[in-house]
């Protein structure tokens, strides 16, 4: 069974619980990595504890299967949208406000589309609206995905930025390929994957946003 947690938006369904018997209940929160067991016999009941571990394992396996299915569905949607979209309008309000060229962006209605890749496959899209709001497609892979402004082939140095606009501005100013990690939480995962892919003599520089004093940032 799944339920919403109070610290996330409505519909998040990050909480879960299973009751394999009248003597055992297991609950947890996926986004926090928390899992707790409750047994009528207390922790000293080995049979109940074993039952709780098995129930938790089954819950994890079910959750992982659901995630894979949803991510595959979102990836298919991303590919359909990307294929059907046209080149981004250089006069799009977001681009004119940022004074940036569209580069490889595409556009669907009023939304700019930033392609996000994982292991070379298009798995998600970040939508940028005219007012600057940014939203990925629902249910898509998030950790380790990245976009790109410029080309990696032949590069001696590669930059990793958080947002697309920062990456595009760096590319235009420095002529270097700039990878889009989307947010600070994804910088490390993207950097590690990029390091594995690129030759050892290619330098990688993190160009993180200087917003450490913003409320809620680490």
Region locations from a protein language model:
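Active-site-proximal loop/helix of nucleotide/amide-processing enzymes and allied scaffolds
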Residues: 189-193, 213-218
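Non-catalytic accessory segments of DNA primases and related replication-initiation nucleases
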Residues: 1-93, 211-213
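Phosphate-handling DNA/RNA-contact segment within nucleic-acid enzymes
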Residues: 73, 111-200
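Structured loops at beta-to-helix junctions and adjacent beta-edge loops in soluble globular domains
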Residues: 30-32, 117, 128, 209
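Conserved phosphate/metal-binding and DNA-contacting active-site motifs used
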Residues: 57, 61-149
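Acidic beta-strand-to-loop metal/phosphate-binding motif
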Residues: 201-214
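Conserved beta-strand termini and adjacent loop/short-helix elements that scaffold enzyme active sites
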Residues: 108, 181, 207-209
């Amino acid at each position: 069974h799944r339920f919403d947690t109070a610290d996330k938006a409505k519909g998040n369904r990050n909480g879960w619980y299973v009751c394999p018997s009248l003597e055992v209940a297991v609950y947890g929160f996926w986004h926090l990595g928390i899992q707790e067991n409750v047994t009528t016999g207390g922790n000293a009941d080995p049979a109940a504890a074993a039952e709780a571990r098995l129930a938790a394992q089954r819950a994890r396996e079910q959750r992982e299967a659901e995630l894979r299915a949803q991510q595959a569905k979102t990836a298919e949607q991303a590919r359909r949208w990307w294929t059907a979209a046209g080149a981004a309008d250089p006069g799009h309000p977001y681009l004119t406000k940022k004074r940036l060229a569209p580069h490889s962006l595409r556009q669907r209605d009023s939304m700019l589309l930033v392609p996000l890749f994982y292991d070379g496959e298009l798995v998600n899209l970040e939508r940028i609206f005219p007012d600057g709001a940014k939203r990925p497609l629902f249910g898509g892979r998030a950790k380790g995905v990245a976009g790109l402004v410029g080309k990696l082939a032949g590069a001696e140095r590669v930059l990793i930025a958080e947002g697309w606009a920062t990456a595009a501005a760096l590319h235009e100013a420095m002529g270097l390929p700039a990878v889009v990690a989307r947010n600070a939480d994804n910088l490390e995962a993207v950097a590690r994957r990029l390091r594995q892919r690129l030759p050892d003599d290619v330098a990688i520089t993190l160009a993180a946003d200087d917003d450490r004093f913003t409320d809620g940032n680490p």
